[in-house]
Design a protein with these regions (language model features):
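Conserved lysine of the Walker
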Residues: 63
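Pre-Walker A (Motif I) flank of P-loop NTPase domains
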Residues: 49-55
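Hydrophobic positions on the alpha1 helix immediately C-terminal to the Walker A/P-loop
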Residues: 66, 70
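N-terminal pre-P-loop "Q-motif" helix
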Residues: 33-49
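Walker A (P-loop) phosphate-binding loop of P-loop NTPases
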Residues: 60
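Interdomain "pre-motor" coupling segment immediately N-terminal to P-loop NTPase/helicase cores
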Residues: 1-21
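Conserved helicase motor core of P-loop NTPases
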Residues: 171-226
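Conserved P-loop NTPase motor core of helicases/translocases
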Residues: 78-93, 97-158, 199-200, 209-210, ...
Length: 226
């Protein structure tokens, strides 16, 4: 119920318009020495203009690259100092390892959801809640498919209404141990603007596995893999 309520509120807020968004993206591409593909550009623009967005894609499709782009552009467009950026942007993940990876790629602090909500181990309660909400304005959650419905509900309770929320993950990943296939369910609800990343970039030792997974996902498996 809390999740549905928050989605409804965010969808009814006025969208943000940035006059210089296209120019700023081109400048960022130069600065980072990269060229975003069409899906990535769509993901970045949607995240900055919509109030709630889902970005989904398999391993190696550039989700972390997009998160870095969103945070940099948000800082530039809102003229935030590094200190202000750490106060306005919250990068969250279900595990410490995923949070560390987020922090390393963006140069911003990242937290596990439990830490962000100030979980009290003794009482099993969150100090950040509907009565004492978090102050951040841009919240990006990575590995969303790993979060169960109860934890996401608690997180949504602790967030203010006038925010931008970006849910990132792989909807084909194994679901959370707890209840609900939350990312898949949210995508299937069609209530949230969703951008799907289709291009595979990462080609390391696991490139065969990634390519195979991608072909199975897209139902384009060729005889070369059999």
């Amino acid at each position: 119920l809390e999740i549905i309520k928050k989605i409804h509120i965010l969808n009814n807020l006025k969208k943000t318009k940035y006059k210089t968004l296209e120019t700023d993206i081109k400048e960022l591409e130069k600065y980072l020495n990269i060229t975003y593909n069409e899906d990535q550009l769509n993901a970045i623009k949607t995240s900055l203009t919509e109030n709630i967005t889902i970005i989904t894609g398999g391993p190696g499709t550039g989700k972390t690259t997009i998160i870095r782009g969103i945070t940099r552009l948000y800082q530039d467009l809102n003229k935030l100092s590094p200190k202000e950026a750490t106060e306005e942007i919250a990068l969250l993940a279900p595990t410490g390892r995923a949070a560390k990876r987020l922090s390393e790629s963006t140069n911003l602090p990242a937290y596990t959801i439990h830490r962000f909500l100030k979980w009290n181990k003794e009482t099993n309660e969150f100090q950040v809640n509907e009565y004492d909400k978090a102050m951040q304005k841009l919240i990006i959650i990575d590995e969303t498919s790993m979060i169960d419905i109860n934890l996401l509900g608690s997180l949504f309770k602790g967030l203010r209404d006038n925010i931008k929320l970006v849910l990132v993950g792989d909807d084909n990943q194994l679901p959370s141990v707890g209840p609900g296939q939350i990312l898949k369910d949210l995508i299937n609800s069609e209530k949230i603007k969703t951008v799907k990343l289709n291009t595979l970039y990462r080609q390391k030792d696991d490139s065969y596995i990634n390519k195979l997974a991608e072909e199975i996902r897209n139902n384009t498996l060729t005889e070369n893999f059999i």
